[in-house]
Curated annotation (Swiss-Prot):
Disulfide bridge partners, by residue number: 46-104, 60-114, 78-129, 85-92
Localisation: Secreted; Lysosome; Cytoplasmic granule
Protein name: Ribonuclease K6
Function field: Ribonuclease which shows a preference for the pyrimidines uridine and cytosine. Has potent antibacterial activity against a range of Gram-positive and Gram-negative bacteria, including P.aeruginosa, A.baumanii, M.luteus, S.aureus, E.faecalis, E.faecium, S.saprophyticus and E.coli. Causes loss of bacterial membrane integrity, and also promotes agglutination of Gram-negative bacteria. Probably contributes to urinary tract sterility. Bactericidal activity is independent of RNase activity.
Site feature (Facilitates cleavage of polynucleotide substrates) residues: 59
Positions annotated as glycosylated: 55, 100
Membership in a protein family: Belongs to the pancreatic ribonuclease family.
Signal peptide start and end residues: 1-23
One Pfam family hit: RnaseA
Subunit structure: Interacts (via N-terminus) with bacterial lipopolysaccharide (LPS).
Amino acid sequence: MVLCFPLLLLVLVLWGQVCPLHAIPKHLTKAHWFEIQHIRPSPLQCNRAMSGINNYTQHCKPQNTFLHDSFQNVAAVCDLLSITCKNGWHNCHQSLKPVNMTDCRLTSGKYPQCRYSAAAQYKLFIVACDPPQKSDPPYKLVPVHLDSIL
């Protein structure tokens, strides 16, 4: 019995590496998944917008921020000076101007009945950018992660 616990722990750790909680859906590129999660040109109702994201992940995402701008404008931030990301990588870029955004926070419910509150904001943002994958728009770099809101 004592041997079983370490073995179970090892299996769980390895499973987490294979199937991370925030895995990108297989048929999407990192940039497309970023667009689905974080780009909405106009203000939105959080319950409706988050249901689209939660349907991919099959759980209630605790928090999410939607930038009210175009993918093209957010991708243009990737052309600005690189800065250090929260994870220590150097592929982040900060917007020069604040944008309107909506912060959605889980207030109650279990998937698929997730309920969110909404907070309108006007702030700067930092995105992580990578070279595009084959089916991404043909920019030099594309946003793949919303690293921070300032």
